[in-house]
Swiss-Prot record:
The lineage of its organism: Bacteria, Pseudomonadati, Pseudomonadota, Gammaproteobacteria, Chromatiales. This is Protease HtpX. GO terms for cellular component: plasma membrane. Binds 1 zinc ion per subunit. The chain crosses the membrane at residues 5-25, 43-63, 159-179, 198-218. Zn(2+) binds at residues 148, 152, 225. Its EC number is 3.4.24.-.
Amino acid sequence: MIKRVILFLATNLAVLLVLSISMRLLGIESLLNQQGTDLNLNALLIFAAIIGFSGSLISLAISKFTAKRLTGAQVIERPRSTTEVWLLETVQRHARMAGIGMPEVAIYASPEPNAFATGWNRNAALVAVSSGLLEQMNQNEVEAVLGHEISHVANGDMVTLALIQGVVNTFVIFLARIIGHLVDRVVFKTERGYGPAFFITTLIAQTVLAILASLIVLWFSRQREFRADAGGAQLAGKEKMIAALERLGRMAQEGLPEQLQAFGIAGGERSQGWKRLFMSHPPIEERIAALRAEH
Protein backbone atom coordinates (compact mmCIF):
# COMPACT_ATOMS: atom_id res chain seq x y z
CA MET A 1 0.00 0.00 0.00
CA ILE A 2 2.81 2.40 0.92
CA LYS A 3 4.56 1.80 -2.41
CA ARG A 4 1.30 2.47 -4.25
CA VAL A 5 0.75 5.75 -2.37
CA ILE A 6 4.32 6.90 -3.01
CA LEU A 7 4.02 6.02 -6.70
CA PHE A 8 0.82 7.98 -7.19
CA LEU A 9 2.00 10.95 -5.14
CA ALA A 10 5.21 11.04 -7.17
CA THR A 11 3.23 10.77 -10.39
CA ASN A 12 0.93 13.57 -9.35
CA LEU A 13 3.82 15.83 -8.35
CA ALA A 14 5.57 15.07 -11.63
CA VAL A 15 2.46 15.95 -13.62
CA LEU A 16 1.99 19.15 -11.64
CA LEU A 17 5.63 20.06 -12.27
CA VAL A 18 5.28 19.40 -16.00
CA LEU A 19 2.09 21.45 -16.08
CA SER A 20 3.76 24.34 -14.27
CA ILE A 21 6.78 24.31 -16.60
CA SER A 22 4.55 24.00 -19.67
CA MET A 23 2.49 27.02 -18.65
CA ARG A 24 5.67 29.04 -18.27
CA LEU A 25 7.16 27.88 -21.57
CA LEU A 26 3.91 28.60 -23.40
CA GLY A 27 3.83 32.05 -21.90
CA ILE A 28 0.53 31.50 -20.13
CA GLU A 29 1.89 32.59 -16.76
CA SER A 30 3.39 35.81 -18.17
CA LEU A 31 0.15 36.45 -20.08
CA LEU A 32 -1.81 36.17 -16.86
CA ASN A 33 0.58 38.58 -15.17
CA GLN A 34 0.27 41.06 -18.04
CA GLN A 35 -3.48 40.99 -17.62
CA GLY A 36 -3.04 41.86 -13.98
CA THR A 37 -4.38 38.60 -12.66
CA ASP A 38 -1.62 38.39 -10.06
CA LEU A 39 -2.00 34.61 -9.85
CA ASN A 40 0.68 32.48 -8.18
CA LEU A 41 0.42 29.22 -10.10
CA ASN A 42 2.88 27.31 -7.92
CA ALA A 43 0.98 28.17 -4.76
CA LEU A 44 -2.29 27.29 -6.48
CA LEU A 45 -0.88 23.90 -7.55
CA ILE A 46 0.13 23.08 -4.00
CA PHE A 47 -3.22 24.25 -2.63
CA ALA A 48 -5.12 22.18 -5.21
CA ALA A 49 -3.05 19.06 -4.48
CA ILE A 50 -3.59 19.36 -0.72
CA ILE A 51 -7.33 19.85 -1.05
CA GLY A 52 -7.67 17.33 -3.88
CA PHE A 53 -5.94 14.51 -2.03
CA SER A 54 -7.24 15.28 1.45
CA GLY A 55 -10.84 14.43 0.65
CA SER A 56 -10.13 11.17 -1.17
CA LEU A 57 -7.55 9.92 1.34
CA ILE A 58 -9.72 10.77 4.35
CA SER A 59 -12.65 8.99 2.70
CA LEU A 60 -10.42 5.95 2.16
CA ALA A 61 -9.18 6.00 5.76
CA ILE A 62 -12.71 5.92 7.17
CA SER A 63 -14.19 3.75 4.41
CA LYS A 64 -14.84 0.71 6.62
CA PHE A 65 -16.55 2.79 9.28
CA THR A 66 -18.60 4.64 6.66
CA ALA A 67 -19.62 1.44 4.88
CA LYS A 68 -20.82 -0.15 8.12
CA ARG A 69 -22.84 2.92 9.03
CA LEU A 70 -24.39 3.36 5.58
CA THR A 71 -25.43 -0.27 5.15
CA GLY A 72 -25.90 -1.33 8.76
CA ALA A 73 -23.49 -4.20 8.10
CA GLN A 74 -22.96 -6.50 11.07
CA VAL A 75 -19.48 -8.01 11.32
CA ILE A 76 -19.48 -11.74 12.08
CA GLU A 77 -17.53 -11.95 15.34
CA ARG A 78 -18.85 -15.35 16.40
CA PRO A 79 -20.71 -17.33 13.74
CA ARG A 80 -24.26 -18.20 14.80
CA SER A 81 -25.26 -20.38 11.86
CA THR A 82 -23.80 -22.81 9.38
CA THR A 83 -24.08 -20.10 6.71
CA GLU A 84 -21.91 -17.71 8.73
CA VAL A 85 -19.38 -20.47 9.43
CA TRP A 86 -19.23 -21.23 5.70
CA LEU A 87 -18.82 -17.52 4.86
CA LEU A 88 -15.87 -17.13 7.22
CA GLU A 89 -14.19 -20.31 5.99
CA THR A 90 -14.66 -19.36 2.33
CA VAL A 91 -13.33 -15.82 2.78
CA GLN A 92 -10.39 -17.15 4.79
CA ARG A 93 -9.56 -19.66 2.04
CA HIS A 94 -9.79 -17.03 -0.70
CA ALA A 95 -7.72 -14.56 1.32
CA ARG A 96 -5.00 -17.15 1.87
CA MET A 97 -4.95 -18.01 -1.84
CA ALA A 98 -4.76 -14.30 -2.74
CA GLY A 99 -1.95 -13.67 -0.26
CA ILE A 100 -3.75 -11.11 1.91
CA GLY A 101 -4.75 -10.91 5.54
CA MET A 102 -8.14 -12.15 6.68
CA PRO A 103 -10.70 -9.35 6.15
CA GLU A 104 -13.65 -8.64 8.38
CA VAL A 105 -16.74 -10.42 7.08
CA ALA A 106 -20.14 -8.81 7.46
CA ILE A 107 -23.77 -9.25 6.43
CA TYR A 108 -26.13 -6.34 5.82
CA ALA A 109 -29.89 -6.47 5.52
CA SER A 110 -31.07 -5.83 1.95
CA PRO A 111 -33.37 -7.79 -0.34
CA GLU A 112 -31.17 -6.89 -3.32
CA PRO A 113 -28.33 -9.32 -4.14
CA ASN A 114 -25.04 -7.47 -3.79
CA ALA A 115 -21.67 -7.49 -2.04
CA PHE A 116 -18.81 -5.06 -1.60
CA ALA A 117 -15.27 -4.78 -0.28
CA THR A 118 -13.59 -1.72 1.16
CA GLY A 119 -10.73 -0.62 3.41
CA TRP A 120 -7.45 1.27 3.10
CA ASN A 121 -5.27 -1.75 3.94
CA ARG A 122 -5.37 -4.96 1.91
CA ASN A 123 -4.53 -6.87 5.08
CA ALA A 124 -7.33 -5.29 7.13
CA ALA A 125 -10.23 -4.91 4.71
CA LEU A 126 -13.97 -5.47 4.98
CA VAL A 127 -16.00 -7.83 2.80
CA ALA A 128 -19.78 -7.62 3.15
CA VAL A 129 -22.64 -9.47 1.50
CA SER A 130 -26.34 -8.67 1.50
CA SER A 131 -28.94 -10.97 3.01
CA GLY A 132 -30.60 -10.99 -0.41
CA LEU A 133 -27.44 -12.41 -1.98
CA LEU A 134 -27.35 -15.28 0.50
CA GLU A 135 -31.05 -15.99 0.00
CA GLN A 136 -31.17 -15.84 -3.79
CA MET A 137 -27.86 -17.40 -4.85
CA ASN A 138 -26.49 -20.88 -4.27
CA GLN A 139 -23.18 -21.58 -2.51
CA ASN A 140 -21.16 -21.87 -5.71
CA GLU A 141 -22.38 -18.47 -6.89
CA VAL A 142 -21.79 -16.82 -3.51
CA GLU A 143 -18.30 -18.34 -3.44
CA ALA A 144 -17.55 -16.69 -6.79
CA VAL A 145 -18.90 -13.35 -5.56
CA LEU A 146 -16.64 -13.57 -2.51
CA GLY A 147 -13.70 -14.38 -4.79
CA HIS A 148 -14.52 -11.29 -6.85
CA GLU A 149 -14.49 -9.07 -3.75
CA ILE A 150 -11.30 -10.63 -2.39
CA SER A 151 -9.68 -9.90 -5.76
CA HIS A 152 -10.62 -6.23 -5.39
CA VAL A 153 -8.81 -6.21 -2.05
CA ALA A 154 -5.78 -8.13 -3.33
CA ASN A 155 -5.47 -5.81 -6.34
CA GLY A 156 -5.54 -2.74 -4.09
CA ASP A 157 -8.44 -1.31 -6.07
CA MET A 158 -9.84 0.81 -3.23
CA VAL A 159 -6.49 2.53 -2.67
CA THR A 160 -5.83 3.03 -6.37
CA LEU A 161 -9.30 4.44 -6.97
CA ALA A 162 -8.89 6.89 -4.08
CA LEU A 163 -5.52 8.06 -5.40
CA ILE A 164 -6.83 8.48 -8.94
CA GLN A 165 -9.70 10.49 -7.49
CA GLY A 166 -7.14 12.63 -5.66
CA VAL A 167 -5.24 13.38 -8.87
CA VAL A 168 -8.49 14.19 -10.67
CA ASN A 169 -9.65 16.44 -7.81
CA THR A 170 -6.34 18.30 -7.93
CA PHE A 171 -6.68 19.23 -11.58
CA VAL A 172 -10.35 20.13 -11.25
CA ILE A 173 -9.62 22.55 -8.41
CA PHE A 174 -6.54 23.97 -10.16
CA LEU A 175 -8.17 24.59 -13.54
CA ALA A 176 -11.44 25.87 -12.08
CA ARG A 177 -9.63 28.55 -10.09
CA ILE A 178 -7.56 29.62 -13.09
CA ILE A 179 -10.77 30.07 -15.06
CA GLY A 180 -12.31 31.96 -12.16
CA HIS A 181 -9.28 34.27 -11.95
CA LEU A 182 -9.33 34.99 -15.66
CA VAL A 183 -13.01 35.87 -15.73
CA ASP A 184 -12.79 37.97 -12.58
CA ARG A 185 -9.66 39.92 -13.55
CA VAL A 186 -9.79 40.09 -17.35
CA VAL A 187 -13.52 40.21 -18.05
CA PHE A 188 -14.88 41.99 -14.98
CA LYS A 189 -11.67 43.99 -14.30
CA THR A 190 -11.59 43.29 -10.57
CA GLU A 191 -8.36 44.86 -9.27
CA ARG A 192 -8.27 43.86 -5.61
CA GLY A 193 -9.44 40.74 -3.90
CA TYR A 194 -12.08 38.57 -5.50
CA GLY A 195 -15.37 39.75 -6.91
CA PRO A 196 -18.60 37.73 -7.17
CA ALA A 197 -17.58 36.69 -10.71
CA PHE A 198 -14.65 34.69 -9.35
CA PHE A 199 -16.74 32.62 -6.98
CA ILE A 200 -19.61 32.07 -9.41
CA THR A 201 -17.30 31.19 -12.32
CA THR A 202 -15.14 28.91 -10.18
CA LEU A 203 -18.20 27.07 -8.89
CA ILE A 204 -19.60 26.55 -12.39
CA ALA A 205 -16.22 25.54 -13.83
CA GLN A 206 -15.52 23.16 -10.97
CA THR A 207 -18.91 21.49 -11.42
CA VAL A 208 -18.46 21.04 -15.17
CA LEU A 209 -14.85 19.86 -14.86
CA ALA A 210 -15.77 17.45 -12.06
CA ILE A 211 -18.41 15.82 -14.26
CA LEU A 212 -15.92 15.46 -17.12
CA ALA A 213 -13.18 14.22 -14.79
CA SER A 214 -15.50 11.62 -13.29
CA LEU A 215 -15.40 9.86 -16.66
CA ILE A 216 -11.75 9.00 -15.96
CA VAL A 217 -12.57 7.51 -12.56
CA LEU A 218 -15.55 5.59 -13.93
CA TRP A 219 -13.45 4.21 -16.80
CA PHE A 220 -10.93 2.87 -14.30
CA SER A 221 -13.75 1.45 -12.21
CA ARG A 222 -15.06 -0.49 -15.20
CA GLN A 223 -11.60 -1.86 -16.01
CA ARG A 224 -11.02 -3.08 -12.46
CA GLU A 225 -14.31 -5.01 -12.59
CA PHE A 226 -12.93 -7.14 -15.42
CA ARG A 227 -9.80 -7.80 -13.35
CA ALA A 228 -11.83 -8.69 -10.27
CA ASP A 229 -13.99 -11.06 -12.32
CA ALA A 230 -10.85 -12.77 -13.60
CA GLY A 231 -9.51 -12.97 -10.05
CA GLY A 232 -12.79 -14.39 -8.80
CA ALA A 233 -12.63 -17.02 -11.54
CA GLN A 234 -9.13 -18.01 -10.42
CA LEU A 235 -10.17 -18.30 -6.78
CA ALA A 236 -13.55 -19.97 -7.18
CA GLY A 237 -13.56 -21.31 -10.73
CA LYS A 238 -14.54 -19.79 -14.06
CA GLU A 239 -17.89 -21.55 -14.36
CA LYS A 240 -18.90 -20.46 -10.87
CA MET A 241 -17.99 -16.85 -11.67
CA ILE A 242 -19.94 -16.94 -14.93
CA ALA A 243 -22.94 -18.52 -13.17
CA ALA A 244 -22.86 -15.80 -10.50
CA LEU A 245 -22.80 -13.03 -13.10
CA GLU A 246 -25.60 -14.67 -15.07
CA ARG A 247 -27.70 -14.86 -11.92
CA LEU A 248 -26.97 -11.19 -11.12
CA GLY A 249 -27.91 -10.25 -14.67
CA ARG A 250 -31.39 -11.67 -14.09
CA MET A 251 -31.87 -9.84 -10.80
CA ALA A 252 -32.46 -6.25 -9.75
CA GLN A 253 -29.13 -4.49 -9.26
CA GLU A 254 -29.75 -1.85 -6.64
CA GLY A 255 -29.53 -1.65 -2.87
CA LEU A 256 -26.12 -0.10 -2.15
CA PRO A 257 -25.76 3.57 -1.16
CA GLU A 258 -24.29 5.74 -3.90
CA GLN A 259 -20.95 6.03 -2.06
CA LEU A 260 -20.49 2.24 -2.25
CA GLN A 261 -21.94 1.39 -5.65
CA ALA A 262 -18.52 1.38 -7.33
CA PHE A 263 -17.37 -1.27 -4.84
CA GLY A 264 -20.31 -3.66 -5.26
CA ILE A 265 -20.33 -6.61 -7.62
CA ALA A 266 -23.74 -5.83 -9.12
CA GLY A 267 -24.27 -3.00 -11.58
CA GLY A 268 -23.63 -2.36 -15.22
CA GLU A 269 -27.13 -2.62 -16.65
CA ARG A 270 -27.34 -2.55 -20.43
CA SER A 271 -26.85 1.05 -21.60
CA GLN A 272 -26.39 2.58 -25.00
CA GLY A 273 -24.35 5.51 -26.30
CA TRP A 274 -22.98 8.14 -23.97
CA LYS A 275 -24.73 6.66 -20.91
CA ARG A 276 -22.14 3.88 -20.89
CA LEU A 277 -19.49 6.48 -20.01
CA PHE A 278 -21.19 7.10 -16.66
CA MET A 279 -21.40 3.45 -15.60
CA SER A 280 -19.21 2.24 -12.72
CA HIS A 281 -19.54 -1.38 -13.93
CA PRO A 282 -19.37 -2.83 -17.45
CA PRO A 283 -22.56 -4.49 -18.71
CA ILE A 284 -22.96 -7.99 -17.27
CA GLU A 285 -22.94 -9.57 -20.73
CA GLU A 286 -19.55 -7.98 -21.51
CA ARG A 287 -18.11 -9.28 -18.24
CA ILE A 288 -19.34 -12.79 -19.02
CA ALA A 289 -17.96 -12.59 -22.57
CA ALA A 290 -14.56 -11.51 -21.21
CA LEU A 291 -14.47 -14.51 -18.88
CA ARG A 292 -15.47 -16.92 -21.64
CA ALA A 293 -12.71 -15.50 -23.87
CA GLU A 294 -10.04 -16.34 -21.28
CA HIS A 295 -8.23 -19.64 -21.69
